[in-house]
Amino acid sequence: MGFDVLLDQVGGMGRFQICLIAFFCIANILLFPNIVLENFTAFTPGHRCWVPLLDNDTVSDNDTGTLSKDDLLRISIPLDSNLRPQKCQRFIHPQWQLLHLKGTFPNTNETDTEPCVDGWVYDRTSFLSTIVTEWDLVCESQSLKSMVQSLFMAGSLLGGLIYGHLSDRVGRKIICKLCFLQLAISNTCAAFAPTFLVYCILRFLAGFSTMTILGNTFILSLEWTLPQSRSMAIMVLLCSYSVGQMLLGGLAFAIQDWRVLQLTVSTPIIVLFLSSWKMVESARWLIINNQLDEGLKELRRVAHTNGKKNTEETLTAEVIWKGEMIAVIK
């Protein structure tokens, strides 16, 4: 008797499997936005240097005459090759001669430029706030933006190696619960990160657990379904990833502050952690690791949920051991 035969007896694709896959789909929908979150929270808006004539509230209209904002921008910031204001440079001195106004303002031929030493002004049409505008990750610091996603993926790789090994040693269920807790804490704290360094560390920890959860949902789904149903289970789980991406797009459209968006996608993880206490362990893993009593307990629970009362009553250790069951499972 192989494990798949035993699984068929307790219900290979019954109410239990449907509820299990449905829970994992909901979990994936809520988890997947964490992977691509920086597409929105790290969005780089249009920006230019802060210049006194335009952005200093103490400069009165008498100082600039009747010049428009476009005129003040023209004399304060040089143009790039596309004739648009440069994003990372400004004139050291206003270039009044560029307006072809003679005798109205002092003339100067000093066209030297300097970096944005006083900061930047951002276009907040799409997003009121992102981590880019929060910590000025532009110009010389623009490489730091990509470092956030790199750290998240590095955490995913390292977490997959460590937690993947632990899942085979101590079980899928306990590792899933641990990862849910770690992700809930790290992602929620990231919404209140006071510095960019703290934010990077928290996103690394979030990546450490996210991929492990997604991997274990696949494993548990496969280990609790029959071979003929596994392709359908995988397809449904993969579709839930796409739903998660669409959900994030809708949330990002409605929530334009990165901290609020971060907190919004993090809060449901707490609910998933609380719900994970009702998860079942893989009976296949329990039997392989000589935890026969626990394996029987989980199988009977599945049989009861699937309405297999006769199997629930006749399922014993002798039935599992019959025909060298352990050797077949391994």
Swiss-Prot record:
TM helices/strands, residue ranges: 16-36, 146-166, 178-200, 204-226, 234-254, 258-278
Name of one Pfam family that matches: Sugar_tr
Coiled-coil segments on the chain, per record: none
Membrane association type: Multi-pass membrane protein
One annotated GO molecular function: transmembrane transporter activity
Recorded catalytic activity of this chain's protein: estrone 3-sulfate(out) + glutarate(in) = estrone 3-sulfate(in) + glutarate(out); 17beta-estradiol 17-O-(beta-D-glucuronate)(out) + glutarate(in) = 17beta-estradiol 17-O-(beta-D-glucuronate)(in) + glutarate(out); taurocholate(out) + glutarate(in) = taurocholate(in) + glutarate(out); 5alpha-androstane-3alpha,17beta-diol 3-O-(beta-D-glucuronate)(out) + glutarate(in) = 5alpha-androstane-3alpha,17beta-diol 3-O-(beta-D-glucuronate)(in) + glutarate(out)
SUPFAM superfamilies in the cross-refs: MFS general substrate transporter (SSF103473)
Domain of life: Eukaryota
UniProt keyword terms in alphabetical order: Cell membrane, Ion transport, Lipid metabolism, Lipid transport, Membrane, Steroid metabolism, Transmembrane, Transmembrane helix, Transport
An annotated GO BP: sterol transmembrane transport
Location(s) in or outside the cell: Cell membrane
Entry GO CC: plasma membrane
Known function: Renal transmembrane organic anion/dicarboxylate exchanger that participates in the reabsorption of conjugated steroids including estradiol-17beta-D-glucuronide (or 17beta-estradiol 17-O-(beta-D-glucuronate)), androstanediol glucuronide (or 5alpha-androstane-3alpha,17beta-diol 3-O-(beta-D-glucuronate)), and estrone 3-sulfate, as well as bile acids taurocholate and glycocholate, driven by an outward gradient of dicarboxylates such as glutarate or succinate.
Family named by the database record: Belongs to the major facilitator (TC 2.A.1) superfamily. Organic cation transporter (TC 2.A.1.19) family.
Protein name, UniProt field: Steroid transmembrane transporter SLC22A24
